[in-house]
């Protein structure tokens, strides 16, 4: 088998396996719920497909958590994502601290850009995610497990294998492919654009450090920030960025500009240190 075909099969296989696990795990969880509630299994599956928000506590969140944990175990045990302590043994705490700052400074500028682009999430999907993030186990699934498993799959496995083929000056091809795949995996335009852009940064961090720890830290901070913002403004999910500054447009633009400049400055520091 030539190297190109091997890379393609492995890359596609990683994504397909991860996607299938997200779907497949809904069936045993739905079966358990159907048995406990003494309702037809087919009816539960229909609810999950048509009205998932009605079973968010009973099926959606448990199946998501199970799928994430199973994916982590599978990718690590099969060594699709190799485990190494090489990076953490260097005690890169300063870099990781800078990555946390970078992620925090990036939140508002990106929100402003997406708002200007007119990118809005489908209302049903938005309602589902907002509801999940108001549940304790939903927060664990979205803010903690999702960043961990997605870094293991999309950087530790997918990008790793792509970099074996697209090496050197072609590394950006691998980073772009993994970022776009990561974006498309989210299944809606709003998240696809956001995740693809984030995926470029996450991929670059992995490429420079050969470790998923830096990208995982950034991803965790990003998702936790999203949860905090959602919970802070849960009563008004359609709030605009300018409203965070009392509808004072000059103040909003100024703060977003300063935040963007700080993010760029921190990024340049990270670039020098890795």
Please provide the spans of the model-predicted regions:
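Structural signal for the C-terminal ends of transmembrane alpha-helices
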Residues: 73-83, 205-209, 264-273
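Juxtamembrane helix-loop-helix connectors linking adjacent transmembrane helices
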Residues: 33-55, 80-149, 159-164, 238-244
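C-terminal membrane module of polytopic membrane proteins
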Residues: 220-274
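Alpha-helical transmembrane segments
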Residues: 7-22, 97-106, 177
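Hydrophobic residues within alpha-helical transmembrane segments
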Residues: 13, 17, 145, 177-181, ...
């Amino acid at each position: 088998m030539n190297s190109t075909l091997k890379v393609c099969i492995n890359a596609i296989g990683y994504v397909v396996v991860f996607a299938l696990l997200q779907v497949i795990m809904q069936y045993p969880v739905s079966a358990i719920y159907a048995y406990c509630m003494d309702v037809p299994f087919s009816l539960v599956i229909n609810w999950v497909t048509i009205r998932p928000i009605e079973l968010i506590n009973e099926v959606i969140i448990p199946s998501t958590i199970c799928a994430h944990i199973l994916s982590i175990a599978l990718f690590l045990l099969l060594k699709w994502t190799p485990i190494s302590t090489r990076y953490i043994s260097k005690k890169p705490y300063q870099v990781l601290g800078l990555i946390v700052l970078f992620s925090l400074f990036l939140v508002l500028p990106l929100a402003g850009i997406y708002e200007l682009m007119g990118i809005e999430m489908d209302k049903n999907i938005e309602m589902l995610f907002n509801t999940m993030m108001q549940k304790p186990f939903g927060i664990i699934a979205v803010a903690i497990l999702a960043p961990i498993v997605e870094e293991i799959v999309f950087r530790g496995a997918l990008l790793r294998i792509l970099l074996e083929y697209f090496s050197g000056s072609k590394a950006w091809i691998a980073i772009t492919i993994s970022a776009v795949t990561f974006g498309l995996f989210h299944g809606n335009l709003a998240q696809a654009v956001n995740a693809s852009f984030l995926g470029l940064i996450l991929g670059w961090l992995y490429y420079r450090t050969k470790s998923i720890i830096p990208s995982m830290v950034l991803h965790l901070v990003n998702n936790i920030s999203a949860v905090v913002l959602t919970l802070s403004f849960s009563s008004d999910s359609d709030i605009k960025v300018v409203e965070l500054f009392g509808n004072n447009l000059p103040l909003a633009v100024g703060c977003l500009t300063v935040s963007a400049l700080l993010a760029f400055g921190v990024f340049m520091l990270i670039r020098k240190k890795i």
